[in-house]
Amino acid sequence: RIPSSAASDVYKRQPSDMMDGRIGLIRKNLDKHRYQDVQILSYAVKYASSFYGPFRNAVGTKGILKGDKKTYQMDFKNKNEALREVSIDIKEGADMVMVKPGMPYLDIISLIKKQFQIPIIAYQVSGEYSLIMNGIKRNIINEKAIIESLISFKRAGANAIVTYFADRILKYL
């Protein structure tokens, strides 16, 4: 079933759970209900990462949620799985892909860019943000590290970036 918001101002869908076949099912249902213009952002490359820790602490889910996301998120040591999952999701109808977290996987962004003709969204997660902010607060690095980190995504091949620094980078634009 397609939510009514798909017919209004929402033109993208992004299932973040990475379950196999999810993109194909969403595309099939969107097309069936004449929402061919709704784009799908695939979270095909979502690593089981320690960099999610600060977010889980901030929202209070660290000790509450049961189960282990490592059962469906990717092993950070594996690059071939990322390329395989991107290929599958493109065949199922994905219009763009997310790489999450971003900074530790700049090589993966670059490989996807070289192998596929699809927009890539890099997600700079809470742990990446925390590392940079702690460095700035302790005067270990300066605030220009924010821009440097974002430029690295673009240089690797990302078409867009999701970051907790959005409000801070406005002064650099």
Predicted stretch roles:
Residues 26, 89, 153:
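Conserved, mostly hydrophobic/aromatic
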Residues 1-7, 11:
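Single conserved hydrophobic/aromatic residue that forms the stacking wall/gate
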Residues 23, 86-87, 109, 150:
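Generic hydrophobic/aromatic pocket-lining and core-packing "Φ" positions
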Residues 20-50, 105-131:
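Alpha-helix-loop-beta-strand connector modules within alpha/beta enzyme cores
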Residues 13-15, 40-43, 97-99, 120-123, ...:
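Hydrophobic faces of well-ordered beta-strands that scaffold small-molecule active sites
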Residues 9, 30-36, 61, 93-95, ...:
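Glycine-enriched alpha-helix->loop->beta-strand junction motifs that scaffold or abut catalytic
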Residues 124-135, 143-173:
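Extended, intrinsically disordered, low-complexity segments
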Residues 62-83, 132-147:
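Active-site mouth loops of central-metabolism enzymes
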